[in-house]
């Protein structure tokens, strides 16, 4: 896979994805969208990948959309945006629904679509210096990248409305208090703690994690009865896995369960 917007490696069942256009602020441009979708596909279908760790190089996590590209040609703007979001939105959906849990590490400013993108991750860790800037209303547009879906679920509907309409910038502590991120980690410990979390998840019951991720997504729109039925069907599927059976036997034998992701 040839990449220009990212660095990518797989180590110990963790797919490590790094935003790698530091000289441009890691923008969510067409190259980003296309390659992010390629990476999402790889992480979805590769059985050796059991968790995903996303971080970034440079002064910013991401400045969000590429305003220079957006403001270049008014006649083509709608077509340009539609083409770019097609790949980006497919990627976000794949990361949200894949079996592998996704961990995002934010060391600095995340703006616009980057905030929406990280809101879709399963875990988000941030340095104290990280900031989260809504950005969209500043240029007269609306949230994309799943922001209108994930932000209300992380922050609550009223808080998400305030964040987006008033074009707020949250500190790392404010983001943690709002539910946008999991926790704030000292900068010197951030990379290690994120890797430990991704590694721990990579050693877990991957297929069960995937079922849980999809149940949590469905819970926002399902009735109680339909969600109970979804749970029953998912439980039937996971109890057929080697991981579930072997873990039950290990617990009965007072041994530590070892999960293989199958």
What are the residue ranges of the model-derived segments?
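Short, charged, surface-exposed hinge/linker loops at domain edges
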Residues: 216-222
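Glycine- (often His-adjacent) and acidic-residue-rich active-site loop
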Residues: 56-91, 110, 223
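Hydrophobic alpha-helical membrane-association signature
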Residues: 32-35, 84-87, 117, 190, ...
């Amino acid at each position: 896979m040839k990449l220009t917007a990212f660095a990518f490696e797989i180590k110990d069942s963790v797919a490590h994805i790094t935003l790698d256009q530091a000289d441009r602020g890691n923008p969510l441009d067409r190259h980003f969208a296309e390659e992010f979708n390629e990476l999402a596909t790889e992480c979805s279908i590769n059985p050796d990948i059991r968790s995903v760790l996303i971080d970034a190089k440079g002064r910013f996590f991401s400045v969000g959309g590429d305003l220079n590209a957006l403001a270049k040609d008014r006649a083509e703007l709608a077509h340009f945006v539609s083409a770019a979001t097609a790949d980006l939105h497919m990627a976000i959906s794949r990361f949200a629904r894949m079996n592998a849990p996704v961990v995002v590490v934010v060391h600095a400013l995340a703006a616009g679509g980057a905030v929406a993108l990280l809101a879709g991750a399963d875990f988000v860790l941030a340095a104290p210096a990280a900031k989260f800037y809504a950005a969209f209303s500043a240029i007269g547009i609306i949230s994309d990248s799943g922001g209108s879906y994930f932000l209300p679920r992380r922050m609550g509907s009223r808080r998400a409305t305030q964040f987006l309409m008033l074009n707020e910038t949250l500190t790392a502590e404010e983001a943690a208090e709002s539910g946008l991120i999991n926790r704030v980690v000292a900068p010197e410990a951030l990379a290690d703690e994120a890797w430990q979390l991704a590694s721990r998840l990579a050693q877990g019951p991957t297929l069960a994690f995937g079922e849980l991720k999809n149940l949590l997504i469905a819970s926002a729109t399902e009735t109680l009865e339909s969600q109970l039925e979804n749970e029953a069907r998912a439980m039937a599927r996971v109890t057929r896995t080697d991981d579930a059976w072997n873990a039950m036997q290990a617990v009965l034998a007072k041994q530590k369960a070892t999960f293989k992701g199958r």
